[in-house]
């Protein structure tokens, strides 16, 4: 019996030590950590980071584009695209979801409603009164869809870039994410190797586009948010409480609203398979489909 107890204690130490090392120095995000540009919007669940970009006066068209990022990578994924929208005369609003980037990490269940209501709260806080153009990348796609269903009069158009919601869920793959304690241990211990593995696989040098992020720069920017408490909780809670695999019913409903829609998808997407375009076009048949041959899941920053 004594040997069993000693053995269990050794196993506990082996598991606890790397977890302690990885989590002990995590910081609480504060306003002093924010970039010089942008700020916090005080919402019901906490402070949400946002930043505005404005076109030159002579190009301004008085239209607002809101860029909604995906599961784990915050607003920097839009850096290479902003210039094109500004040149076209749009004002741009970017933000970080709760639990990501420079937004606070409330200890809550990260459900669909949290993301939809935070988008609504942000627009209200910024006194955006006119309908906006929503652009959703990956997880941002379902968020844009759900928001449009709930607030159709607030949306001018939708653009869906490699939208989540058309993936086949495999219960034998990454099952540990859904398990309490197990998921927390794995993600805290192995960090970016697990969190950003899908993006890393798709982010391969060399890059011909001067606006593209190198793998090194991507990991540096994406990993910055991991030094703050609550990031891993936000990812795990989102995976457990927001269905990112099957959003067909929602997209079918939003298709009935007949909002102008653009869908952009890469044929070699290893995260949200390109075959999802067939089902999306069934639900939103009026959508314009832009196919990027050999494009992968990192198409917003590659």
Each predicted region: which residue ranges?
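Catalytic histidine-centered segment of alpha/beta-hydrolase-like enzymes
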Residues: 271, 295-302
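Short beta-strand/loop motif that positions the catalytic acidic residue
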Residues: 257, 263-265, 269
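Conserved HGGG/HGGXW glycine-rich cap/lid loop of the alpha/beta-hydrolase fold
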Residues: 53-102
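Conserved alpha/beta-hydrolase catalytic His-Asp/Glu region
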Residues: 29, 189-255
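Alpha/beta-hydrolase fold catalytic core
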Residues: 1-63, 87-90, 248
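Conserved alpha/beta-hydrolase "acid-adjacent" motif
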Residues: 270-276
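Flexible "cap/lid" loop of the alpha/beta hydrolase fold
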Residues: 149, 156-189
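Active-site loop/oxyanion-hole signature of alpha/beta-hydrolase fold enzymes
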Residues: 43-45, 51-57, 87, 97-135, ...
């Amino acid at each position: 019996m004594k040997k069993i107890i000693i053995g269990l204690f050794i196993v506990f130490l082996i598991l606890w030590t790397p977890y302690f090392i990885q989590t002990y120095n995590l910081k609480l995000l504060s306003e002093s950590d924010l970039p010089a540009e942008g700020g916090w919007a005080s919402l019901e669940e906490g402070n949400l980071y946002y930043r505005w970009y404005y076109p030159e006066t002579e190009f301004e068209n008085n239209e607002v584009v809101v860029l909604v990022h995906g599961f784990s990578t915050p607003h920097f994924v839009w850096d290479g695209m902003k210039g094109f929208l500004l040149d076209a005369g749009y004002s741009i609003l970017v933000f970080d979801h709760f639990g990501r980037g420079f937004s606070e990490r409330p200890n809550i269940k990260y459900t669909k409603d949290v993301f939809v209501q935070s988008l609504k709260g942000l627009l209200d806080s910024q006194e955006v009164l006119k309908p906006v153009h929503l652009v959703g990348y990956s997880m941002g796609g379902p968020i844009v869809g759900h928001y449009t269903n709930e607030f159709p009069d607030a949306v001018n158009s939708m653009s869906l870039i490699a939208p989540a919601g058309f993936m086949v869920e495999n219960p034998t793959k990454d099952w540990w994410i859904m398990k309490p304690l197990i998921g927390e241990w794995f993600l805290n211990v192995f960090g970016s190797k697990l969190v950003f593995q899908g993006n890393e696989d798709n982010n391969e040098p060399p890059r011909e586009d001067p606006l593209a992020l190198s793998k090194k720069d991507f990991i540096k920017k994406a990993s910055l948010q991991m030094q703050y408490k609550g990031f891993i909780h936000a990812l795990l809670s989102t995976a457990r409480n927001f269905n990112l695999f099957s959003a067909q019913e929602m997209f079918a409903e939003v298709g009935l609203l007949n909002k102008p829609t653009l869908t952009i998808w890469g044929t070699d997407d290893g995260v949200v398979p390109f075959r999802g375009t067939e089902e999306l076009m069934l639900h939103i048949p009026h959508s314009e489909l832009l196919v990027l041959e050999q494009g992968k899941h990192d198409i917003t920053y590659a």
